[in-house]
Structure formats: C-alpha cells, structure tokens
C-alpha cells in the first residue's frame, strides 16, 4: 500500500543524537529502572531525542497539548513504554499503532524493541509527515508511518494493535477486529472509569466474532501521581 500524498513540511530538527537534555535523560533512566524496563544508553538517547523532536514538531503541527502539565519524557515517552510491562514485544512481531498522532505509543516502543516491526497509521497527512520525519531523524529501521484510514488497511494482518486514542474501547475493538491475527491483542492506554466501556466491548464481541474474548485492566497510578486513574487495557483475541 502506498502512502497518500501529504503536505510537505521540513523537519525542524536535524542534529545528531548527542548532548540532549540531561535532566530528561536522568528522569527517564530513573523511571525505567524503577519498573525494570531495560534500555541501553543509545536507546535512552534516542528516546530523549524523540521527546525533543516531538516538542519541535508540535510547534508547527498540533500533535500533543501545548500546555503540558508534566514533562514530555514522563507524560508521553515513558507512558508509552509502560505497555511493555504487560506485553512482551518479540522479534518479527507485526504491530499496528492506530491513530498514532505524533508517533505515540509507536515510536517509543520501536526504539525500545528494534526487532519488532511497527506500522504507524493516522488519517491526518501532516501528522504522518511529522512521524516519518522523526522516524528518519532517529534512524529507525523497524518503523514506518502511513497516511491512511483504518478502513483502507483491509487485507493487512497484525499480531498486536496499539492505541492511545480517547475513543471508547468498543470503537477501538471494532477498528482492530478485521486486522488482528488469531491470538492477537489490542493494547490501549486509557484513563477514567472503564466499566461501561469494557462491558460494551465484550457485548459487541460476543455478538460478532468473539473479539475481545477477555479484557484485562492494569492500573499504573502507583508509578507516578501523574498517572492517577490511568490504566493499560489489554483486549485479547482467542
């Protein structure tokens, strides 16, 4: 599938990966160590650099809030990595980041798991231009950004679908359903009371092809006060 044409925007940053924000680096190293997320120094450098790239692109395109209430390295980068606490990304695994926006959670996870293949999809061309620019600047060989609507991905199959969107779980499951392989899973970063969302997703699954067959909730509010009421949601396909 060929990406759609999108607006040409020049990358706002084109610097080597070095001498990046030492405070952000120390924060990320400490956070990852506290959760047993093993990353080498080069991966830490790339994650910090990605945070900088995200901020620079955000000045041109609305990728994340411009009124941040927490450091980008915590609120966006580390938050994305927390999915790996509940899903072991493996070599050769095919992962779809649905509605990636500014590359979240796909780019941080692609940095952390270089042997896993990530496809980042968004319906907004400018966002995909930004994502591909960041992927290129970071030198990632296992991530690709595609300008597409989910309905246009027919015929593709993935082991895992990721989402950080605010859409209800039933909607996300509906998007993921035709794209997930048998035994695959949908992993979402969500917040708030999800009881009704989960019930609706399970009901709809039971009335269609059985996906999701189960839903797990993993609270992350004990990791940082910022993650109050936030959870990782794992919806499985048998």
UniProtKB/Swiss-Prot annotation:
Pfam families: GidB. It comes from the Bacteria. One of its GO terms (molecular function) is rRNA (guanine-N7-)-methyltransferase activity. Its EC number is 2.1.1.-. It is found in: Cytoplasm. One of its GO terms (cellular component) is cytosol. The keyword S-adenosyl-L-methionine applies. Keywords: Cytoplasm, Methyltransferase, rRNA processing, S-adenosyl-L-methionine, Transferase. S-adenosyl-L-methionine binds at residues 99, 104, 122-124, 150-151, 164. Specifically methylates the N7 position of a guanine in 16S rRNA. HAMAP family: 16SrRNA_methyltr_G. Belongs to the methyltransferase superfamily. RNA methyltransferase RsmG family. NCBIfam families: rsmG_gidB. This is Ribosomal RNA small subunit methyltransferase G. The gene is rsmG.
